[in-house]
Amino acid sequence: MLAGEAEAGRLRIAPRCIMTGGETLGKAVRDRLVQVFGAQVRNSYGASEFLPIAWECPHGQLHVNEDWVLLEPVDEQMRPMPPGQRSHSVLLTNLANLVQPLIRYDMGDQVTWSGQRCSCGSALPVIEVRGRSDDVMQVPSQRRGETVSLLPLALCTVIEEECGVFDFQLRQHGPSTLV
């Protein structure tokens, strides 16, 4: 990570703004970038099939680039989700790619459509990205006798903030075994 190189004195840059994307940006990573570089940090949401789906505004909200994409949060039966409820997945229609159009492409991402206008003044819709559905770990609950869903962001937040470890891999070998 560039922050580590800057802390070690091997990288001397002073960016005004750092744009991130590719993975969910956790608070610990954001805070570290701000501390090391003293710059604004802005996240984006995209996919290999289309960049950018949404950009973070100065107020910390992700605004859907709806001039170029249609984004449809859906439940497990592919029915539209109302604002304020987390989707099972999201369907993407790319309005910009005339060579290889994507129409209602199931991305597998869990998002929540805000339904509220952002205080930054943008008319673009606001979403919260929770992560990829197939990245969610299912672990048994000792108390309730059912499974509990662990989102990658929740695990990353604890490991990054409590242990200061930013590069790691978890492997689930069984219902209750993480390595």
Put a short name on every predicted segment.
Residues 1-179:
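Active-site glycine/GP-rich loop and adjacent strand/helix microenvironment
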